[in-house]
């Protein structure tokens, strides 16, 4: 039960600005504010004017403010809440916060208002995470993805999957408790068909979510190739800054260099890697091993070639590993100014001449057809991991049925699938999950 009153600066407090907002929420929020506010206590969803005074030092006036009253449960937090709109000076804002703390409120933890909103049933974790995603969005596509989650349709889609599973679990429980009960045998083709239908929906969600996750967390692009083909030069030219060291000495890049880049509403995360070659130098070899590891982590593999160098076994290894892992593979020939002819197998660029438009447009084209209006996807790695776990549990259940296992074995996997789906929208009893998630929210949110 939530039984204390919390406060934090929701807007402002770090730089001087026009207006700051201080939020107070909890069972004693009205009484705490009344101690330092000279105006009237308004009815719910009204605004009243008055002074904030220092009641501990002769009622000295601190500021003229507007108080917004949100009483009862019909508000964001789901409990009595007051928002004080004061002048936005850093000193004034923090002075009012200190008065609220001195008069009985506790400083809120990061994300605690949103956590209370979740615990009070005002929103689920999908919307809570969407709010945090919107606050931290750095591209137009990220903003659209976050706002899309506000309408609750994704939550309803997850709930529908849970309801379908719950019905089947209920049927199986009856067959376990009352084996003599005459109804559809849970090991019939009909049950398998229904489970496969749910699994196929989840498979589609995973497919859609891979792309939405890339858009929100950044599309990971690993730049690979032999030494001195221009990997670092291409990265620097795209970023328009000297992020990576460029020399004529083979093996200059020995560790991973990462950089974020925004282009046409998308966020890209470039990973420049060590040139891949046969070497006995221990440190360089470690860097080369890391380069191959990045193929597994990447969404896109940029394979850079130099027309003045012949292809070798390392080029084949890069290409084959990217294809074996079903990565988006983009072969790029740098130093196009050295060529007289081209073919359609490669993209042709010149880092030296800053001629990189074909590469930029290729990267955008891969993701331009993403359907941001689809409700059947989840946004982040936490949600995606859970939907994948639910998918695996369903696969295990279907396999167990086909192998003729007893219902009490099959039902374990079905309950696990249901539990994973439930964790996507959130359960109030999962304290570790809530702690981990809300700690990343802003203070005052």
UniProtKB/Swiss-Prot annotation:
Give me the comment on cofactor binding: Binds 1 potassium ion per subunit.
Per UniProt, where does GTP bind?
228-233, 247-253, 272-275
Species annotation: Mycoplasmopsis agalactiae (strain NCTC 10123 / CIP 59.7 / PG2)
Q: Where does Mg(2+) bind?
A: 232, 253
Q: What is its EC number?
A: 3.6.-.-
Q: Which domain of life is it from?
A: Bacteria
Arranged from A to Z, the UniProt key words for this protein are:
Cytoplasm, GTP-binding, Hydrolase, Magnesium, Metal-binding, Nucleotide-binding, Potassium, tRNA processing
Q: Which InterPro entries match?
A: G_TrmE, GTP-bd, GTP-bd_TrmE_N, GTPase_MnmE, MnmE_dom2, MnmE_helical, P-loop_NTPase, Small_GTP-bd
Tell me the cofactors it needs: K(+)
Q: Name one Pfam family in it.
A: TrmE_N
Which named protein is this? tRNA modification GTPase MnmE
Q: What cellular-component terms does GO give this entry?
A: cytosol
Binding of (6S)-5-formyl-5,6,7,8-tetrahydrofolate, residues: 23, 83, 122, 445
One MF term in GO for this entry?
A: GTPase activity
Q: Which GO biological process entries does UniProt record here?
A: tRNA methylation; tRNA wobble uridine modification
Tell whether Hydrolase is among the UniProt keywords.
Answer: yes
What is this protein's function per UniProt? Exhibits a very high intrinsic GTPase hydrolysis rate. Involved in the addition of a carboxymethylaminomethyl (cmnm) group at the wobble position (U34) of certain tRNAs, forming tRNA-cmnm(5)s(2)U34.
Q: Name where it mostly resides.
A: cytoplasm
Q: How does it assemble?
A: Homodimer. Heterotetramer of two MnmE and two MnmG subunits.
The UniProt entry's sequence similarity note says:
Belongs to the TRAFAC class TrmE-Era-EngA-EngB-Septin-like GTPase superfamily. TrmE GTPase family.
Q: In what residue span(s) does the TrmE-type G domain sit?
A: 218-368
Q: Could you say which residues bind K(+) here?
A: 228, 247, 249, 252
Q: Where in the cell is it found?
A: Cytoplasm
Name the NCBIfam families for this protein.
Answer: mnmE_trmE_thdF, small_GTP
């Amino acid at each position: 039960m939530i039984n204390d009153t919390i406060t934090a600066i929701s807007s402002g407090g770090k730089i001087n600005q026009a207006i700051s907002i201080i939020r107070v929420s909890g069972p004693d929020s009205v009484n705490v504010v009344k101690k330092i506010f000279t105006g009237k206590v308004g009815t719910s969803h009204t605004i009243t004017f008055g002074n904030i005074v220092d009641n501990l030092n002769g009622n000295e006036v601190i500021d003229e403010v507007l108080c917004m009253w949100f009483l009862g449960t019909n508000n964001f937090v789901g409990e009595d809440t007051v928002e004080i709109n004061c002048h936005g000076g850093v000193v004034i804002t923090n002075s009012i916060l200190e008065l609220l703390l001195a008069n009985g409120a506790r400083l809120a933890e990061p994300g605690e208002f949103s956590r209370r909103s979740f615990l009070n049933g005002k929103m689920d974790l999908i919307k809570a995470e969407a709010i945090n995603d919107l606050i931290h969005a750095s591209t137009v596509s990220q903003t659209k993805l976050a706002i899309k989650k506000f309408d609750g349709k994704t939550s309803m889609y997850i709930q529908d999957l849970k309801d379908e599973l719950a019905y089947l679990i209920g049927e199986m429980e009856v067959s376990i408790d009352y084996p003599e009960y005459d109804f559809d045998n849970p090991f019939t083709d009909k049950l398998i068909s229904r489970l496969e239908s749910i699994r196929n929906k989840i498979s589609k969600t995973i497919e859609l979510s891979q792309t939405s996750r890339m858009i929100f967390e950044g599309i990971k692009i690993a730049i690979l190739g032999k030494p001195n083909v221009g990997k670092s030069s291409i990265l620097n030219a795209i970023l328009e800054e000297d992020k990576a060291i460029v020399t004529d000495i083979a093996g200059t890049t020995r560790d991973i260099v990462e950089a974020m880049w925004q282009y046409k509403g998308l966020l890209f995360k470039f990973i420049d890697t060590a040139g891949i070659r046969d070497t006995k130098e221990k440190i360089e070899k470690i860097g080369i091993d890391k380069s191959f590891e990045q193929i597994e982590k990447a969404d896109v593999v940029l394979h850079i070639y130099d027309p003045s160098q012949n292809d070798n076994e390392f080029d084949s290894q890069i290409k084959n590993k990217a294809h074996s892992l079903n990565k988006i593979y983009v072969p790029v020939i740098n130093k196009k100014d050295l060529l007289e002819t081209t073919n359609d197998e490669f993209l042709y660029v010149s880092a030296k001449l800053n001629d990189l438009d074909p590469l930029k447009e290729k990267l955008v084209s891969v993701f331009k057809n993403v359907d941001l209006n689809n409700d059947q996807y989840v946004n982040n790695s936490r949600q995606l991991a859970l939907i994948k776990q639910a998918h695996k549990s369903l696969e295990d259940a279907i396999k167990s049925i086909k192998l003729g296992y007893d219902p009490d074995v099959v039902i374990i996997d079905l309950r696990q699938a249901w539990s994973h789906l439930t964790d996507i929208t959130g359960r109030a009893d999962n304290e570790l999950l809530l702690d981990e998630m809300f700690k990343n929210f802003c203070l005052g949110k």
